[in-house]
């Protein structure tokens, strides 16, 4: 990608609102407005990781995006999350997220036939929290909640190489 396109994308994705569920029992969503890639408050920090891909993820003919963000709620975990930003005809809006892993190492993020392909390292059960060693190559599909209630992202395959 050219530098100008990357700078423009980083400005957009680093200065928008992302939503997080406060838990199924509360049925609430917390909004985090990023400024220059960061949202910081006590016990709730969100960062844009400068990893993104464009595609038509809801198949409406408009350019959507998928980005990697991290969330930290005050503990030792930095939850790497895939966020789908869907074009509503005027702007990109965060519609769905999928937690990838605590401190995942993202090797690559690509668009493939309207889906997101991620090559990354995640934690094996016996890994220390500092260093994931399990390599996975997953394909993620955005699912419009109006078409399939309760589902927003589907993992289509999980290719694991130990």
Task: Show which residues each predicted segment covers.
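Short consensus segments that form the blades of beta-propeller domains
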Residues: 42-43, 72-77, 126-132
């Amino acid at each position: 990608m050219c530098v100008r396109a990357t700078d423009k994308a980083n400005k957009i994705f680093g200065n928008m609102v992302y939503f997080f569920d406060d838990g199924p029992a509360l049925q609430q969503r917390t909004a985090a407005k990023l400024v220059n890639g960061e949202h910081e408050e006590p016990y709730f920090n969100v960062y844009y990781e400068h990893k993104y891909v464009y595609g038509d993820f809801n198949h409406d003919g408009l350019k959507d995006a998928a980005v990697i963000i991290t969330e930290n709620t005050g503990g030792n975990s930095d939850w790497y999350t895939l966020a789908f930003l869907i074009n509503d005809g005027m702007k990109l809006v965060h519609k769905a997220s999928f937690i990838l892993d605590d401190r995942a190492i993202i090797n690559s993020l690509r668009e493939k036939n309207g889906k997101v392909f991620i090559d990354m390292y995640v934690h094996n059960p016996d890994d220390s929290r500092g260093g994931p060693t399990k390599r996975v190559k997953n394909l993620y599909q955005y699912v419009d909640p109006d078409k399939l209630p309760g589902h927003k992202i589907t993992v289509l395959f999980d290719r694991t190489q130990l």
